[in-house]
Amino acid sequence: MIGRSIALGLLLGGAGLTAVATAAERCAECVTAGAASATVRVPPGAPLAGYGGMKRRLAFPDVFGRYAHAFWFKPSIGERDPLTTRALVLEAGATRLAWITLDLVGVDRTFVRAVEDELARSGVPKATLVVSASHTHSGPGAFMDSGLMGLVAVDRFDPAVRDALVASAVAAIQQAERTRAPALAAATSVSAPAVTVSRLGKALDPEIVVLKLTSVGGTPLALVWNFAIHGTMLSAANLRLSGDVMGVASARLEQKLGAPVLFVNGAVGDVSPAHHGERAMMDTAAELSTAVEAGWAQARPRPVSTLRISERNVSLPSPAVSLERCFGSWVPGFFAVPLGFAMPRAVSLVAAALDDTAWVTFPGELQTALGQAIKHEAHGRFASVFVAGLSNDYLGYFTTREDTRAATYVACATIYGHAAGRCLADAAIDALRELRPGSRSATRASSACDSGAASR
């Protein structure tokens, strides 16, 4: 009996090894993938970023140096949940993509360059870099070298905070690079539970896109999930560092899957959570993680050999705060506060396609309608498409021409004007089109601003 069991075990083991070997042969030219997840430790007392109101601000700026890392805003008082940096490295032939997600309200180009420079110094092979912020409003501040953003919502720049975040990003990429191996991939979409509401009273995008990556043998390597939601379930009164609902949901998924889970926000400009508070946050995180887990189970990974990247540089109008869009039509339209001294006049969009799954970065908070327009135009070329919002830069809000006219917070924060949202949406569509050329859509409006493209 024992002999039969041994023989059966050897046969089953041999069959398993043969199956893995066969899969490995099928994956001889597969995309390789590596992922990592690491806890971030910022200096104690670092301020929080996201809310600009008085509940987060010091009564007086810290001109006397009472706080080591805070100036305009109150210091944090510890962590509610661990801050996490996650990384995914993809490679196919000479094409490489390094993707970093952080529990931050946003990232600016200076921060991204700091990560790029440190990656180069550390000897990590050169890759197209995407740095995505989750948009939590309870993440650390003081990491942007911008006087304007510091005053408004992030606090004065502190190199110690920025360096800690950059170091975590580089360490995560290095670890992901070390674990890189042939991978199977698949993407799917699931409907989100009713956990968001529109700031503009309009239809929202209920889609959660789930990108599943496994080893050749089926072991989970990484999960990327894309959904639009503001990280404002914790209020401005909260002074504990937190990844908010998206961070909690991702942590739950990591515990179940045993692999890094990267959250990437979507077209979030007009999207708020339906409920607020710590208990509601935990309930919403559970609902979202359950939906994403269903997407993971639904996706059927297969060998994938193509990774394409397209980059598109877009010039922008002069940025300014329009007092008419902030306070109403009674204010003459020519009254505006110019911001050209503090905000860029150009931006770069990165589009990538892993087989029939494509995404494009967006440097801020895009309105749902424009995000859905991007998806609609690209769905003829790709099975799954998503917008990676709050990635590689932060330039405020981008809305439709119609919704820029009303005096709302969203319109007030649309500092590049009523045409910039459509302009960047068109540029994003063009970047996706370059990944898989096809017939030009007859319904797509032409770009409203000059742009240049470089593709490979």
What residue ranges belong to the model's regions?
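N-terminal secretory signal peptides that target proteins for export/translocation
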Residues: 1-2
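Bacterial N-terminal signal peptides
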Residues: 5-16
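Sec/Tat signal peptide C-region and signal peptidase I cleavage site
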Residues: 17-24
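Conserved beta-alpha junction segments in alpha/beta enzyme cores
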Residues: 24-132, 136-268, 273-283, 296, ...
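Anionic-ligand-binding alpha/beta catalytic cores of soluble enzymes and soluble regulatory domains
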Residues: 288
